[in-house]
């Protein structure tokens, strides 16, 4: 199956938040107190209220939820210049569908995003992975389930939001959507 050809970028790159003063030896203005360093490069300059969320914490927790639920999945990881990261968990089960004369298989997908440069909020959503051709090209259709700004107070909200998305996925949304896809197939 085409899933063995999924992109596998390294997403667990070294990262830290350091004060600009410790890097430059000069004081910085209010609102630009810290630098986010990813894989040896400064990718963002942030205020002291910024909440840095390491990929190891976020993506490993998401994967552990799938493991604990005994779901079979394929993982695709995307690293955009050591500043923005995506992990897709493509669920392999009996609820896969084919469209257009058995071409274009559709599988359930959970997508999680995190960025160190501030361009994207940490988010997770439920969607679909569709094989368009055998080289693994895909399109996805999804709804954002949670999206959280990087502030110190909000970092405590991420793991409960992640758990909530996963519980709704297992409870009913996944099965309601697979029933709708089954109707489209007919």
Language model features by range: what are they?
Residues 67-186:
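Intrinsic disorder/low-complexity polar-acidic segments
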Residues 1-61, 70:
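Feature for intrinsically disordered/low-complexity regulatory segments and propeptides
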């Amino acid at each position: 199956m085409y899933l063995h050809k999924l992109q596998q970028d390294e997403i667990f790159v070294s990262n830290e938040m350091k004060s600009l003063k410790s890097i430059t030896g000069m004081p910085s203005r209010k609102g630009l107190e810290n630098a986010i360093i990813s894989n040896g490069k400064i990718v963002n300059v942030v205020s002291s209220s910024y909440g840095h969320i390491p990929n190891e914490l976020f993506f490993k927790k998401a994967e552990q939820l799938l493991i604990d639920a005994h779901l079979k999945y394929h993982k695709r990881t995307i690293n955009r210049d050591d500043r923005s990261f995506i992990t897709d968990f493509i669920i392999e089960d009996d609820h896969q569908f084919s469209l257009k004369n058995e071409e274009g298989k559709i599988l359930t997908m959970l997508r999680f995003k995190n960025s160190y440069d501030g361009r994207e909020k940490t988010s997770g959503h439920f969607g679909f992975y569709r094989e368009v051709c055998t080289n693994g090209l895909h399109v996805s259709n999804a709804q954002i389930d949670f999206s959280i700004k990087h502030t110190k107070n909000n970092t405590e909200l991420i793991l409960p939001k992640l758990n909530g998305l996963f519980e709704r996925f297992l409870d009913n949304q996944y099965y309601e959507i697979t029933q709708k896809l089954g109707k489209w197939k007919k």
